[in-house]
């Protein structure tokens, strides 16, 4: 498990400067340049201070895009492994354990291979960015800033943040994550 105890918080301006210094810009990405593998653990708390809506949106996308692409790479690797395992007549104990873990991770009955094949599939990048932008207010919502919650997933039992002014009959919370990468990982499920 990754350790995030020694992370630092960057403000929006410092994050922008970091991306500029590394030559990471969306125009180049749109023209086919690879996305820089820069993985921030949390969003800048002062995204709204940028003032310019386009700058805020671009910075948000530059933060979230590498996280989504990284998760997609892991999903691709899992998908390759799944199809390799399924192509064999006999599976090793390790392969059976791996399959059992994927069934549990994706919350699928451990006999439904068809459903597992459908579920272990990449996250459509544009949809993930759009949902993260919508659910997190382009990274400015309380849930995003306090709990690294990009996608607004609800929970009734896990650690989460209670919505303010919620209906007293409602018992849900918004899932809270230690780092942004965990929010993206949970989104695939």
Which residues does each PLM region occupy?
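Catalytic cores of secreted/periplasmic lytic hydrolases that degrade extracellular macromolecules
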Residues: 1-130, 134-189
């Amino acid at each position: 498990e990754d350790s995030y105890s020694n992370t630092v918080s960057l403000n929006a301006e410092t994050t922008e400067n970091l991306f500029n210094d590394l030559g990471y810009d969306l125009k180049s990405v749109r023209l086919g340049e690879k996305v820089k593998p820069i993985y921030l653990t949390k969003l800048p708390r002062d995204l709204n201070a940028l003032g310019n809506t386009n700058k805020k949106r671009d910075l948000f996308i530059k933060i979230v895009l590498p996280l989504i692409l990284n998760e997609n790479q892991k999903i691709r690797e899992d998908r390759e492994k799944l199809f390799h395992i399924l192509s064999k007549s006999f599976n090793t104990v390790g392969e059976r354990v791996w399959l059992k873990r994927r069934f549990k991770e994706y919350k699928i009955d451990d006999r439904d291979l068809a459903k597992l094949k459908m579920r272990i599939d990449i996250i459509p990048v544009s949809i993930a960015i759009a949902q993260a932008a919508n659910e997190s207010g382009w990274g400015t919502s309380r849930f995003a800033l306090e709990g690294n919650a990009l996608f607004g997933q609800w929970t009734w039992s896990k650690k989460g943040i209670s919505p303010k002014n919620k209906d007293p009959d409602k018992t849900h919370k918004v899932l809270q994550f230690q780092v942004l990468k965990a929010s993206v990982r949970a989104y695939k499920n």
